């Protein structure tokens, strides 16, 4: 006895799956649609109608003829039961549709001509067509580099903020240097004020009249300089407050 080839065995298995196990008629897209019960057994719609007509099942329930599992009937209509989508795909893609399919049945190239060949004009009922969409990989353009290009956006406001910050730092350093020099000058004037009078008297007693007069005259001069310094300091503070940029 000659053994079947793998292709013939697969064909026989597919053909067996397309038959109802009660009436052994082939499923179709009209009266013998493959209906799936809750127990996952498949029965054609015509056989289910006969089971209901025989009255073997309670109202609103269908008893599976294979395992006696009860399946609730939504709206008490057989048509409300779910169809077996895999068998519907095989039925829909049968005949001339098979010629247009690729070798791998899970891959289908979507073109208008291919879709038109899969749908028969005579099938006016609602059919289910399951399609696996594949991504077609195209060769990348040779002009594009494989290294990703990242462009950093630097708003113009950042430059203005940086400039203002730099100017403020320079202005702050200048102001600090000016205040330090003024403080040193005040200390020198204070030292000169408190030491010039006794030093001048000592020089006058020592008969060094010229130097003594000079040192004694430094007392009112230092007072005048201190007054001028106080006035200049007030003016400078007002000027700095007006010119310094707001933070």
From Swiss-Prot:
Keywords: Cytoplasm, Membrane, Metal-binding, Transferase, Transmembrane, Transmembrane helix, Ubl conjugation pathway, Zinc, Zinc-finger. Its EC number is 2.3.2.27. InterPro entries: RNF182, RNF182_RING-HC, Znf_RING, Znf_RING/FYVE/PHD, Znf_RING_CS. GO terms for molecular function: ubiquitin-protein transferase activity; zinc ion binding. GO terms for cellular component: cytoplasm; membrane. The keyword Zinc-finger applies. E3 ubiquitin-protein ligase that mediates the ubiquitination of ATP6V0C and targets it to degradation via the ubiquitin-proteasome pathway. Also plays a role in the inhibition of TLR-triggered innate immune response by mediating 'Lys'-48-linked ubiquitination and subsequent degradation of NF-kappa-B component RELA. This is E3 ubiquitin-protein ligase RNF182.
């Amino acid at each position: 006895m000659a053994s079947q080839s793998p292709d013939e065995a697969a064909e026989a298995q597919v053909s067996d799956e397309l038959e109802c196990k009660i009436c052994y008629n082939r499923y179709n897209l009209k009266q013998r649609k493959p209906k799936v019960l809750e127990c996952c057994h498949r029965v054609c719609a015509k056989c289910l109608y006969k089971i209901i007509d025989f009255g073997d099942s309670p109202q609103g329930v269908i008893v599976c003829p294979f395992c006696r599992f009860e399946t609730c009937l939504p709206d008490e209509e057989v048509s409300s039961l779910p169809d077996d989508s895999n068998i519907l795909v095989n039925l829909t893609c049968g005949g001339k549709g098979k010629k247009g399919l690729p070798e791998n049945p899970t891959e289908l190239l979507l073109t208008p001509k291919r879709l038109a060949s899969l749908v028969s004009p005579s099938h006016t009922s609602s059919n289910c067509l399951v399609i696996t969409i594949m991504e077609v990989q195209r060769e990348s353009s040779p002009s594009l580099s494989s290294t990703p290009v990242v462009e950093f956006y630097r708003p113009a406001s950042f430059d203005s903020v940086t400039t203002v910050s730099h100017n403020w730092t320079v202005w702050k350093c200048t102001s600090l240097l000016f205040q330090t020099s003024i403080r040193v000058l005040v200390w020198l004037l204070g030292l000169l004020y408190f030491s010039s009078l006794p030093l001048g008297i000592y020089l006058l007693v020592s008969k060094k009249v010229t130097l003594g007069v000079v040192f004694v005259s430094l007392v009112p001069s230092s007072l005048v300089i201190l007054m001028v310094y106080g006035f200049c300091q007030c003016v400078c503070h007002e000027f700095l407050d007006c010119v310094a940029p707001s933070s």
